Amino acid sequence: MVSCGSGTACVLGNDEGYVHVGGTGLGGGTIRGLCKLLFNEDDPVKINSLSLNGDVTKVDHILSDVVSGPIGNLPKNSSAVNFGKGLSLEPNNSDLAAGVINMVAQTILRTAIMSAISSGVSEIVIIGRTPKYKLLTNILEEGFKLYNLNYEFVEGGEYAICLGTI
């Protein structure tokens, strides 16, 4: 299970119980905090809307910008340097929102994939409020497919933590 909240935790559950197998401090709190610092917006609904109109290639160097050929099975439009174009371009707020969400989503994705692989599982359940960012969900879906992992975004998953405490 990948719990995407303010940060992100990866938990392995089976008949014997639950164990924390990984995580990162990046999550929805990072998205809101960085967007507030970069362009003075911390409303998740507005950030989500902005990101869907943004172009991450305006802030990130992608693989085709920095290498001449393929790297494994990664798509050539994968980010190679998050915010690497920040020194040369002037992105708009939508591009910045897309860049922030992309960076957080990629970190969550890699953490989830490595946690799953190291635990020998191929099924991932995603809970939490952070997947409400549509761009983040799209990035996670693409990555899980690339690694042939089965995944499910739980409907009402933003309430899963609350239900688990009852």
Language model regions located:
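Short beta-strand scaffold segments in enzyme catalytic cores
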Residues: G7-G13
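Adenine-nucleotide phosphate-binding core of ATP-dependent small-molecule kinases
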Residues: G72-E123
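Short glycine-aspartate micro-motif
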Residues: M1-S3, G23
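Glycine- and other small-residue-rich loops at beta-strand/loop junctions that grip anionic moieties
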Residues: G23, A97, I101, R129, ...
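Generic secondary-structure signature for well-ordered alpha-helical cores
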Residues: K36-D43, L52, V56, S88, ...
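Glycine-rich phosphate-binding loop plus the immediately following alpha-helix
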Residues: D15-S68
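Glycine-rich phosphate-binding loops at beta-strand->alpha-helix junctions
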Residues: M114-I117, V121-G143, G157-E158
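Glycine-rich phosphate-binding/hydrolytic loop that grips phosphoryl groups
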Residues: I31-K36, D43, Q106, L149-I166
